Amino acid sequence: MHGSPCQDFSRIGKKQGGVKNSGTRSSLLFETIRIIKEMKDKPKWIIWENVKGVLDRNMRDSLFIYLKELEDLGYESKYEILNAMDFGIPQKRERIFVVSCLGANNFSFNKLERKETRPLSEFLEKDVSELYTMTQPYMLKFLNKSIDNSFRGRLKVIKDFSYNIYTKQMRVPNSGIIDIGNGRYRYLTERECLRLMGFDDSDIDKLEEVHSRRKNCTSSKLYKQAGNSIVVDVLMCIISSIMHVSANLLLWMI
């Protein structure tokens, strides 16, 4: 399972793409092919995740070349864009997942077990420090004018779900902000972002031990960890389905 750097595929980045041997971060996608070729025993299953921008007209050639090179190695691949909201997580996070199997691929995205989106309140902390309160006058002025619920199209007020969690959550967070009343707003905390990526609090506690923060400061490292992650619930659903497919195949062979 892997997710190569998405920055050059992203619709909000410089859109440099992931052309093989181009030297862009997203071109590291093709390191997967190199690694598989060097392995004595090829993995039965490969899962790749990335931003849906990889399917844009000026980006998708890289994906199709990747799939063709996997096919040349004996893999059959299937791909689909999945939204975390369809797997219980109240975050509008759409990502492409490619599931490749060495030999015939009986995996089906249609058979994944979708779940009702859980209430956002389950993911929010009850007592949040003033450290996370938005104080930038120009942003507050814009928000309180109620102009189309956005700041340059990027700043949104969270209601039933958050938007895409990226590596940088302060300043103008793509994930949105929380309305705390009386014309005041706050950012999502690091813990909330990680919860919205499917991590439980025990895992987050361990991360906080590793990435200790300075007093009265937020942790850019924890925000980055969240933004670079794959939503756990989506990934586990895919893995569970793969295990089911593999088990059925073994039973058929017996």
List each model region and its residues.
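C-terminal target-recognition/interaction regions appended to catalytic cores
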Residues: 137-254
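N-terminal Rossmann-like NAD(P) cofactor-binding module of classical short-chain dehydrogenase/reductase
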Residues: 1
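Conserved NAD(P)H cofactor-binding loop of Rossmann-fold oxidoreductase domains
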Residues: 4
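Class I S-adenosyl-L-methionine
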Residues: 7-172, 182-186
